[in-house]
Curated annotation (Swiss-Prot):
Record-given protein name: Late embryogenesis abundant protein 1
Region (Disordered): 1-143
Stretches forming Sequence repeats: 47-57, 69-79, 80-90, 91-101
Basic and acidic residues: bias regions: 47-60, 69-143
Family: Belongs to the LEA type 4 family.
Segments for region (4 X 11 AA approximate repeats): 47-101
Regions of compositional bias (Low complexity) in chain numbering: 1-17
Length: 143
């Protein structure tokens, strides 16, 4: 296999590696985001359930003020969940942007490798032509 083909293959493999790494980061970020959302929702549900369990009988006996406090708690939990969801969305946007940048960088690297490969091929061609010319001159000199 020629050096040019090796360089091209290495460039393609490196670009593939960049793309795989970018893909893996996006997937990992998305999984992390889903886990964050899930755990936040679960925590809010557990807190709400704990509140209901511990205050079940008391709530039935309490006045409207106790019911108002429970409603405030639910609203705060909803606000917190919404804030967390918004932050997770922002993080996902940042991750997508970073992945795009990585993809662009990989493309630029691939283009650099292609240009380097073309330059090397031209250099080898010129060297081979020069050596062939020199060999021809030597043969003519022997005649």
């Amino acid at each position: 296999m020629s050096s040019q083909q090796n360089q091209n293959r290495q460039g393609e493999q490196q670009e593939q590696g960049y793309m795989e790494a970018a893909k893996e980061k996006v997937v990992n970020a998305w999984e992390s985001t889903k886990e964050t959302l899930s755990s936040t929702a679960q925590a809010a549900a557990e807190k709400t359930a704990e509140f209901r369990d511990s205050a079940g009988e008391t709530i039935r006996d309490l006045t409207g003020q106790a019911q108002e406090k429970g409603q405030e708690f639910k609203e705060r939990a909803g606000e917190k969940a919404e804030e967390t969801k918004q932050r997770a969305g922002e993080k996902m946007d940042e991750t997508k942007q970073r992945a795009g940048e990585m993809r662009e960088n990989a493309g630029q690297k691939m283009e650099e490798y292609k240009q380097q490969g073309k330059g090397k091929a031209e250099e080898l061609r010129d060297t081979a032509a020069e050596k062939l010319h020199q060999a021809g001159e030597k043969v003519k000199g022997r005649d």
